[in-house]
Amino acid sequence: MSKMNPNEKKENASKNENVNNEEATNLQEEQSNAADEAAGSDNVSGEVEALQKKYNELNDSHLRLMAEFDNYRKRTMREKADLIKTGGEGALKNLLPIIDDFERALQNVRAAEDVEAVKEGVDLIFGKFMGYLSQQGVKPIEAIGKPFDTEEFEAIATIPAPEPDMKGKVLDCVQTGYTLFDKVIRHAKVVVGE
């Protein structure tokens, strides 16, 4: 063995001490990192649990909303079918008194000797019926003397106009047309002058 001088010994001792200090520092850092990782994994697992809980809540809410919407859709379809089936019920109920009037008129026609009284009764029933239709928004289309318009009229015949200013105008109405709130529900069948 060679002898070391005292300065070399100090240097070696200093180097060994530095190495030992570095190893200790590295060991402390590794322990600190391991503790951080353990704490981090606890945080991650806590976050995963929280996210899983939130997912389950949202999924449950979504399923409930889907079921609620499906029930709503079925209910509205049922209500719509009922409305289509019985939608005219109110209008038909209001026609029943007019039908009763017609029945009474028919009973009186058979026994009546006064034709004028029967005619007057039928006129009253007709007026009552037309009044009801008017309340419902149904109105007759005025045709005679008006210029022919395909939106309101259906020409079933043309005849020579009796006067020159009647050309292209309605001369006669064979069947009355009707509107429902200004929408034509039946065109008037008319004779037009040419």
From Swiss-Prot:
One annotated Gene Ontology cellular component of this protein: cytoplasm
Ranges of compositional bias, category Polar residues: 24-34
Sorted UniProt keywords: Chaperone, Cytoplasm, Stress response
Matches recorded under SUPFAM superfamilies: Coiled-coil domain of nucleotide exchange factor GrpE (SSF58014), Head domain of nucleotide exchange factor GrpE (SSF51064)
UniProt feature, compositional bias: Basic and acidic residues: 1-14
Main location: cytoplasm
UniProt keyword annotation of Cytoplasm present: yes
Residue segments, region Disordered: 1-48
Gene Ontology process terms (BP): protein folding
InterPro entries named in the record: GrpE, GrpE_coiled_coil, GrpE_head
Keyword Cytoplasm: yes
Pfam families named in the record: GrpE
A GO molecular-function descriptor: protein-folding chaperone binding
Quaternary structure annotation from Swiss-Prot or TrEMBL: Homodimer.
PANTHER family the record matches: GRPE PROTEIN, GRPE PROTEIN HOMOLOG, MITOCHONDRIAL
Function: Participates actively in the response to hyperosmotic and heat shock by preventing the aggregation of stress-denatured proteins, in association with DnaK and GrpE. It is the nucleotide exchange factor for DnaK and may function as a thermosensor. Unfolded proteins bind initially to DnaJ; upon interaction with the DnaJ-bound protein, DnaK hydrolyzes its bound ATP, resulting in the formation of a stable complex. GrpE releases ADP from DnaK; ATP binding to DnaK triggers the release of the substrate protein, thus completing the reaction cycle.
Family: Belongs to the GrpE family.
Name of the protein described by the UniProt record: Protein GrpE
Organism per entry: Parabacteroides distasonis (strain ATCC 8503 / DSM 20701 / CIP 104284 / JCM 5825 / NCTC 11152)
